[in-house]
Regions:
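Cys-His-centered catalytic/binding microenvironment captured across papain-like cysteine peptidases
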Residues: 90-92, 105-111, 331-347
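Short, surface-exposed secondary-structure edge patches
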Residues: 47-52, 131, 283-287
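Short beta-strand and beta-hairpin "edge-sheet" elements
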Residues: 58-86, 164-166, 294-317, 322
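Surface-exposed cap/loop segments at beta↔alpha junctions
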Residues: 46-127
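Short beta-strand-centered interaction patches in the first periplasmic/extracellular domains
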Residues: 2, 71-94, 127-209, 214
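Oligomerization/assembly interface segments of phage tail-like spikes and tubes
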Residues: 27-45, 80-91, 210, 267-268, ...
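Acidic, small/polar-enriched beta strand-loop surface segments
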Residues: 2-5, 180-319, 331-332, 343-347
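Solvent-exposed edge beta-strands and adjacent loop segments
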Residues: 1-32, 187-201
Length: 347
């Protein structure tokens, strides 16, 4: 296993952590929500220097990623002294920056990220990976006047994005484009007995209409189909044979000047499947990474579909202990829904 390092706040001292409770050591990641490390450390003759280095705002470094100690509990059992720590990924220290200025108008995701970091980058860098030009410009009103983390979360919500930090370098992807289809599968009664998931069809739609670029002299006060460079195109999913016609909000995107290109885009945008989200505890370890798309087979409900890994809890010090996996094929995970409710004061 890779070493766990404890580093002081000034980053001038660093020690390897030994004699920690291996059962307690876990790393938990939830897409766009949390990434943290926790461990219990008893003080021993062999780790006294490192033990004393464990303190609030000092760092834990593991697997190339840096975490800031945000929670710590010191306690004793008889003569034995312990520290329980929770260290949050260094990305979340971005909340300490604030952009007071606001911007409004039609903005791209790059425009808004540039605006945030105009107030100072605080050691962070960023890039947007969008080779298929999925990100569209959005109308913004008074974007700003908040801390960096809240502003980034607003971007993730508005643009349908996911952020994957590599320490202080932030990579933004369209949520529909990131992650790899794997050969792994999670099958009920094969590699998991513990399955908890929800299925809902509130957002299921079977038809969508797309409008492309307007002609130069189009009358925008009374638009007609003939005002577009190609007639608006309608895509109807084969799922309509089962569920009937359920119409999704139309797409309006002036980037499109070719009808067939718009048709392909509509196929990507139509939400013609049930939303599935849940969690599983595996019987043994699988090699799964953030965003991987894994075949989930649940015979009792005849469910066989690719679902994305949106949360992983691993136990690196116990090689044979299986990870806990959170799966979802929705744009919003359960944790993000709860977080939104909390922000609105509804829970």
């Amino acid at each position: 296993m890779k070493n766990i390092l404890i580093r002081n706040y000034e980053e001038t001292k660093e020690e390897i952590l030994i004699n920690y409770d291996k059962d307690s050591f876990s790393v938990s990641w939830q897409q766009n929500e949390t990434w943290e490390l926790s461990v219990t450390v008893p003080r021993t003759k062999g780790n006294q220097i490192t033990f004393d280095l464990i303190d609030y705002e000092n760092y834990v470094v593991f697997d190339g990623q840096q975490y800031s100690i945000k929670q710590m509990r010191s306690y004793a059992s008889g003569s034995q002294i312990y520290k329980d720590i929770v260290a949050t990924h260094i990305y979340y220290t971005i909340q300490d920056g604030r952009q007071y200025d606001t911007v409004s108008g039609t903005k791209s995701i790059n425009d808004l990220l540039t605006h945030i970091f105009k107030a100072g980058n605080r050691g962070f860098s960023w890039e947007v990976v969008d080779p298929n030009n999925v990100f569209l410009k959005k109308e913004q009103e008074n974007f700003g006047n908040d801390n960096y983390l809240n502003l980034i979360n607003e971007i993730l919500e508005d643009y349908g994005a996911v952020v994957i930090p590599n320490n202080k370098h932030l990579i933004f992807y369209p949520i529909s484009e990131y992650g790899n289809i794997t050969e792994q599968q999670i099958r009920y009664k094969y590699n998991t007995d513990e399955v908890s998931f929800d299925i809902d069809t509130y957002a299921l739609k079977t038809q969508i209409k797309g409008y492309g670029k307007l002609k130069e002299n189009a009358n925008t006060d009374n638009l007609k189909d003939s005002d577009y460079v190609f007639p608006p195109v309608t895509y109807t999913s084969a799922e309509s044979e089962k569920w009937g016609i359920r119409i999704q909000d139309p797409v309006e995107d002036e980037r499109y000047t070719i009808q067939n290109n718009m048709l392909e885009y509509l196929k990507q945008q139509l939400h013609d499947y049930p939303d599935v989200s849940g969690s599983v505890t595996l019987k043994w370890a699988l090699s799964l990474n953030k965003g991987d798309k894994v075949l989930f087979v649940y015979e009792p409900l005849s469910l066989s579909t690719y679902i994305q890994v949106v949360g992983i809890t691993t136990y690196p010090a116990i090689p044979n202990k299986a990870p806990e996996i959170v799966l979802s094929n929705t744009k919003k995970t359960i944790t993000s829904i709860l977080a939104n409710l909390a922000r609105k004061g509804l829970m």
